[in-house]
């Protein structure tokens, strides 16, 4: 544990309503969404190149292809194309404001802990020692470090309920989904610098 002052401009912001938080949360999830669904249109379904019957004289309705969407085995009308873009745009200023609000709520709930630093040799025991020293062993945690080195990634990758994040990649999703947020001192300084109002 370390003694560190949390800047009120970042960790004590008034949250009038949660609408912006919700927008930022949904924006993160939408950007993470993978598009897998894909259906074939009448032009993509194999076959159907020949006209089923002549245009006139049969008494039946006219059709140009057996892959017509209203036929069995035909294409799909207005189905998913596989190239949908679900991202929801949010301005940088709005994102930063939302993160400040989320951190303020976390601070108010006593979820923020500051440690001196996280020096790792790449061993899991380094991360375990840090977690035990913070007293947050059985909770969903995010650990903020100023730089994600390979050693730090190796040290934390085997631990359940722990996510390693660098300050500029911090999101409302990370904060709201965590029961505890652990800052190293350098990461705290970098976060405050990044989220300051006057940029």
Where in this protein do the model-derived segments appear?
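Extended polybasic, low-complexity segments that bind anionic RNA or targeting/receptor surfaces
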Residues: 1-35, 80-199
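Short coil/turn segments at secondary-structure boundaries
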Residues: 36-42
